[in-house]
Structure formats: C-alpha cells, structure tokens
C-alpha cells in the first residue's frame, strides 16, 4: 500500500494475538481490542513439528468482527494449534529489491532459496503498492524488436506493454518465454524478472540451469511459487516479482522485462483462496473478485516517463476454450496477443504462432510505418485466402484451383514455413544455431516472397530458418545434391 499506511502499520508492530481456528491454509486469529492488524499485513507464528521449529507467515485477508481476523497461510499449517501466539509485523509481506536480487532465486516471501539470508539486511519493499499516478505515465508508443520474424512483422510488441502468450498445454509457451529472456539479455543487456506462478518445480530448475549455462542469469531475478505450494503463495508470487521489477524501473530508471508463467495459475490460486474464505463463486466457479484481482496486478505493469516494465505473460487456456473467464479477463489488459496453435505445432513449425488470430494494437501505419503495415497485411491476406481454399483442396484437389489460387496456396506454404525460426534455447536439442533477424530484413524478406521472387524455390528451403541468406544457402545446397 502507500508509504503512509506502512508507517502507520509499523507503529502497530509486535502486537500479539492467538490462533482460534485452523482450517487448512485458512487461520482465524484473535487480537486484543483496538489492535487489529490492517488488511494485507503479514503475521508470523512459531510452529514446532517433530522437534523441528519453523516460522509460518500469514497474510490478513478479512476482518471478521469481535477482534478476529481471517488470514491465509503462506506455508503448510501442519503442527499449528489453537492458542499459538501470532505476531503482527505491522507491514505487508516485503521482498528485497535492487541489484542484490539479480542472479538469484527467491520465494514469494522474499527469502533467497539459493543463498539463504541474502537481501534481508538491505532495502525491502512491500508487495502491495499503488500503480503510478496517471500524470506520470508514458504517452509515447515504441516497438520492442525481438528478432523473431512472426512476432516483429505480424504481432509487434509494445515497449512497456503487456503481451499475452495464449495456448493449451505443450505448444511452447514456456520455451518462447525462455527465448525472450535470452534475446533481451543478449541484444539489449536488459534486466529481467521471472515470476513462476504455480508451474512445475522441474521447469523452474531447468530454467535456472539453462540461464546459468547461457550466461544470462546475472541479469535476471527469479521468483517462484510453484504448484506444490499453498494457494496463498501462488496468489502473491506475481506481486513479489512485480515489486522487484518496479524498483528497477522507478529507482534505477531501467527498462525492465517481467515474465509471468503462468498468469492462469494466478487466477486459479485466487479462486482457491476465495473458496477457502467462503465467498460465493461466480461464473464457471471462479472468484467474484476475478476482474478486480487481475486489474490490481495489471495496472502496476506500465511505463512511466523515461522507463518501462514490459510484461510477457503465458496464459494457459483451459481445454483450449478462449471464452473461459480466466483468459477472457486477461485479454482486456493486453496490448498484444500471441496465440500458439496446436495445429501449427503439429506441422513442426516453431514458434507455433497463429498469424491469423494473434493481434497487436500497434500494427497500424501511423506507428509501425506504411511499408511494414502493407507487407503485414499482404502476408495475412495470402494466409487467410489459403485457409479459405483448404476445403476445396481437401475435396477436389489442387488441380481444380485457378492458376491465381494455385500461386496463392504455394506462396502461403512458403510463408508458413518461413514464419518458423530457430531459437537460441533450442540449439542443444536441434543442433541448429538460433537466429536474430532485424525487423528491416524481416519486412524485406516477406515483401519479396509475396512478390513471387522465390516462387521457383522448393518449400523445403524455407523450413524454420532465419533470414533470406539462410533460405538461399539451403536452396543452393539442395540444387547441388
């Protein structure tokens, strides 16, 4: 919350209460009259289980009246009993901020997992903060060049914007996020913060080891609240990561990238907490506060004058249903959407971005330029026409198409393959080096393909390569054989 509120809360620190009820991760605590902790305050309680002492952190979620508060535990409550003494910290959950967090792994409470105790002696910020004032927001729109052809041409990302990666399980959301972290560190020497929300512990370990191996870990802070942890942790880990990113933006005046994998798990954790707190469920069983919780997180991810937080959020789509309230609520906050399609992945084209359903609000002539916009529209029109012709091809075959339509289909197939690209993070699996294609080269390449300059090249020459130089090299190799 605000600094004034934190100062007020600090004055109330060390107030002691006692546990009166424990139901799973929900704990009711009674405090002396007139000394109730504020909402979102962190409470601590000492627990001994099998001769091992530990401290459990709780977060105040509700005031029940009669000097009672209902809190959500940030750890398993095994061993917690009625009558246990609970201490009010007088402030929200706080995490370390600054250069000390780079290259390390933290949990949602700000505890360093790879170097215990790191950062606790330095500056810390509460995870509940207000968004920047409206008059401080940046009004300028700028493209974030990624070097990934399909993204830069058809769904350009906004510097300081919010981008959603939509897709079902196993279509490449996490791989694309890892690739973006690598590219930002290599090309821009930028600071990144990765928030792992409710995902697999194995994925977090793999990410840490891969980033260490590729030499980008020193510019990245990682915050994890994985799927084996209580819902309170999974609901707060995104805010913890965002708070670290805000410090780099507001104090160190850096452009920061915030990666959230997976924003659906944030919603899912909120639903679990809502049910545990006894709230009436809303549509499809989600919490009635879904839109509010999403807004509180997303409104803090923004650009202020001279510095920005650009957020890339993986969005799991339950059963590939885009009308589900969780992805639908996320849509409203995004500047660009990148939809990963299982049908494209099944063709072996990666990244499996669907160019016809992915969108960007800045794909306009006034922002990206007339030529970029014109080439992007030509590519989309060819791919759309090819899609419309698929039913005719399936029933009657290619021979029944007009000559013009045959050319359209052949160019569309080349475009589809050329939209694929080798990734740096996939080098060790494919044995093929990753590629960074500048935006100017991308526009030129797709314009030439649309013009028919490569109609005599076989489709195989366009498979998942970088720029036109790679295509020409592949064609030369094929003709030599």
Curated annotation (Swiss-Prot):
Which keywords belong to this entry? ATP synthesis, ATP-binding, Cell membrane, CF(1), Hydrogen ion transport, Ion transport, Membrane, Nucleotide-binding, Translocase, Transport
Question: Is Cell division included in the keywords of this UniProt record?
Answer: no
- Classification via Pfam families: ATP-synt_ab, ATP-synt_ab_N, ATP-synt_VA_C
Q: Name one GO molecular function term.
A: ATP binding
Q: What is its EC number?
A: 7.1.2.2
Gene3D superfamilies xrefs: 2.40.10.170, Bovine Mitochondrial F1-atpase, Atp Synthase Beta Chain, Chain D, domain 3, P-loop containing nucleotide triphosphate hydrolases
| InterPro entries xref list | AAA+_ATPase, ATP-synt_VA_C, ATP_synth_F1_bsu, ATPase_a/bsu_AS, ATPase_alpha/beta_chains, ATPase_F1/V1/A1_a/bsu_N, ATPase_F1/V1/A1_a/bsu_N_sf, ATPase_F1/V1/A1_a/bsu_nucl-bd
Keyword flag Acetylation:
no
Enzyme class label? translocase
Compartments (UniProt record): Cell membrane
Q: Which reaction does it catalyse?
A: ATP + H2O + 4 H(+)(in) = ADP + phosphate + 5 H(+)(out)
NCBIfam families linked: atpD
**PANTHER family noted in UniProt:** ATP SYNTHASE (PTHR15184), ATP SYNTHASE SUBUNIT BETA, MITOCHONDRIAL (PTHR15184:SF71)
What does the sequence similarity comment in the record state about its family?
Answer: Belongs to the ATPase alpha/beta chains family.
Q: What do we know about how this protein assembles, alone or with others?
A: F-type ATPases have 2 components, CF(1) - the catalytic core - and CF(0) - the membrane proton channel. CF(1) has five subunits: alpha(3), beta(3), gamma(1), delta(1), epsilon(1). CF(0) has three main subunits: a(1), b(2) and c(9-12). The alpha and beta chains form an alternating ring which encloses part of the gamma chain. CF(1) is attached to CF(0) by a central stalk formed by the gamma and epsilon chains, while a peripheral stalk is formed by the delta and b chains.
Question: Briefly, what is this protein's role?
Answer: Produces ATP from ADP in the presence of a proton gradient across the membrane. The catalytic sites are hosted primarily by the beta subunits.
Q: What is this protein called?
A: ATP synthase subunit beta
State the organism named in the record. Answer: Corynebacterium diphtheriae (strain ATCC 700971 / NCTC 13129 / Biotype gravis)
């Amino acid at each position: 919350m605000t600094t004034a509120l934190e100062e007020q809360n600090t004055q109330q620190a060390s107030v002691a209460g006692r546990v009166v009820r424990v139901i799973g991760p929900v704990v009711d605590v009674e405090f002396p009259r007139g000394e109730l902790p504020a909402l979102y305050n962190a409470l601590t309680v000492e627990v001994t289980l099998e001769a091992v002492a530990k401290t459990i952190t709780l977060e105040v979620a509700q005031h029940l009246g009669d000097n009672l508060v209902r809190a959500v535990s940030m750890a398993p409550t095994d061993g917690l009993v009625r009558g246990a003494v609970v201490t009010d910290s007088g402030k929200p959950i706080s995490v370390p901020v600054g250069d000390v967090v780079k290259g390390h792994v933290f949990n949602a409470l700000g505890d360093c997992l790879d170097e215990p105790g790191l950062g606790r002696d330095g500056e810390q910020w509460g995870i509940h903060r207000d968004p920047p004032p409206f008059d401080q927001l940046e009004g300028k729109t700028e493209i974030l060049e990624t070097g990934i052809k399909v993204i830069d041409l058809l769904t350009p990302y906004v510097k300081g914007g919010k981008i959603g990666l939509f897709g079902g399980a196993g279509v490449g959301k996490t791989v694309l996020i890892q690739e973006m972290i690598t590219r930002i560190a290599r090309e821009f020497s930028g600071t990144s913060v990765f928030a792992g929300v409710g995902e697999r512990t194995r994925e977090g370990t793999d990410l840490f080891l891969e980033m260490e191996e590729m030499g980008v870990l020193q510019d990245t802070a990682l915050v994890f609240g994985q799927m084996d942890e209580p819902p309170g942790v999974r609901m707060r880990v995104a805010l913890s990561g965002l708070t670290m990113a805000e410090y780099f933006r507001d104090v160190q005046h850096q452009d920061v990238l915030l990666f959230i994998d997976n924003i659906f798990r944030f919603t899912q954790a909120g639903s679990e907490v809502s049910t545990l707190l006894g709230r009436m469920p809303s549509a499809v069983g989600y919490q009635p506060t879904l839109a509010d919780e999403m807004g509180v997180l997303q409104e803090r991810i923004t650009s202020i004058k001279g510095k920005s937080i650009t957020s890339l959020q993986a969005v799991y789509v339950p059963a590939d249903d885009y009308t589900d309230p969780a992805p639908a609520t996320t849509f409203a906050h995004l500047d660009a959407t990148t939809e990963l399609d299982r049908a494209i992945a099944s063709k072996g084209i990666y990244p499996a971005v669907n160019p016809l359903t992915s969108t960007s609000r800045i794909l306009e002539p006034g922002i990206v330029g007339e030529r970029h916009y014109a080439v992007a529209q030509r590519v989309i029109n060819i791919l759309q026409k090819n899609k419309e012709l698929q039913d005719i091809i399936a029933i009657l075959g290619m021979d029944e198409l007009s000559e013009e339509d045959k050319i359209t289909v052949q160019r569309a197939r080349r475009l589809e393959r050329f939209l694929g690209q080798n990734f740096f993070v996939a080098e060790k699996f494919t044995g093929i080096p990753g590629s960074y294609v500048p935006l100017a080269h991308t526009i030129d390449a797709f314009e030439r393909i649309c013009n028919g300059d490569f109609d005599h090249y076989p489709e195989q020459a366009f498979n998942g390569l970088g720029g036109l130089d790679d295509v020409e090299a592949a064609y030369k190799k094929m003709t030599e054989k």
